[in-house]
Every structure is written in C-alpha cells, then in structure tokens.
Amino acid sequence: MYRILIVDDERIERNGIRFLLKKLNMEFDIDEAVNGLDALEKIHQADYDILLTDVKMPFMDGIELIDNVVNEKKKMRCVIFSGCNEFDYAKRAIRLGVVDYILKPVDPKEFKETLEKVVDELEAAKASDELKSKSMEFLYEHALYMLVNGEDIESIPVSYTHLRAHE
C-alpha cells in the first residue's frame, strides 16, 4: 500500500483528488495537508511515497514544498496539480524532478495515467532495492565463507566493495 499526501488549500480540490484516487481501485493510505507548511510538518513526521500538491497556497507554495523535501525524501514521487499554467512554475517543477504537472481542472484520464506511471516507478525502485539487498546478502555470505576458510580479505571481488559503498 502506498502512502499519499494531498496538499491543497481548498478542501473541494483535496476531495476531488481523493475521489479520483479511489476510482483507481488501488490501495492507498491517503493523508491531507492544507498548505505547504502543514505538509512539510507531516512529511517530517511520516514517510509518504507520493506527494500530490497544488502550487499556489498560503504560507508555502507547492514548488517551495518540493524544493524543501526533494533531497531529504529521495524515494518520494511528486506530482503537481494546479490551475497555474505559468511557464516559470513548470520549469522549476521540472528542475526539481516532479513526475508530472497536471493542470486544473484535472482530467481523470490524465490523472490515472500519471498515477499508474508513478506506481510503476515505485514498483521498479522497490524491485531494484530488493535485488541490491539480495546481492549484498549473497556477497556478505561469500565474504564470510572466504574468511572462515582462511582466504585473504583482499581477494574478495571488487563488486563486493563497490556494492558496500552504495549501501
């Protein structure tokens, strides 16, 4: 189950996004925030897989929010949904690595395609992490076997040290 944070200062917009998420027939744990500052607090307190945010909100806009969390929460996927079609916002969003910038009113088909893409990315990242974990486990066991059998630690394959560095 993926955790989603919906951020918009307008309740009707949050409700609309929640409705579209439920129509996807996927399991999501959905939380909401009323502005960027509220969202930032929630993000620091919990792990979210997907951030769906508006741009123009009081206290902290969606671009600032993403800018504040993008380096800290590298695995979280960000999608903007906004009535703001100014090129500068879209350009900044792209630089921050958002998955998509959906204009309001949100087209259900576009929303579905975007969320499917996000879920596919999350699944691929999870599979990659699991593969790395299994590779590390194998290499640890191999290194232990070599040490127990009196082999020199320096003879352990370079791939072991390479994987260890990327843990």
What is each PLM-predicted segment?
Residues 94, 103-164:
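Interdomain helical linkers/hinges and coiled-coil/dimerization scaffolds
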Residues 11-31, 45:
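Two-component/phosphorelay signaling modules centered on CheY-like receiver
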Residues 57:
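Receiver (REC) domain active-site loop signature in two-component systems and cognate sites
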Residues 32-41, 62-65:
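Helix N-cap/capping motif at the beta->alpha junctions
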Residues 4, 46-52:
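Active-site beta3 strand of CheY-like receiver
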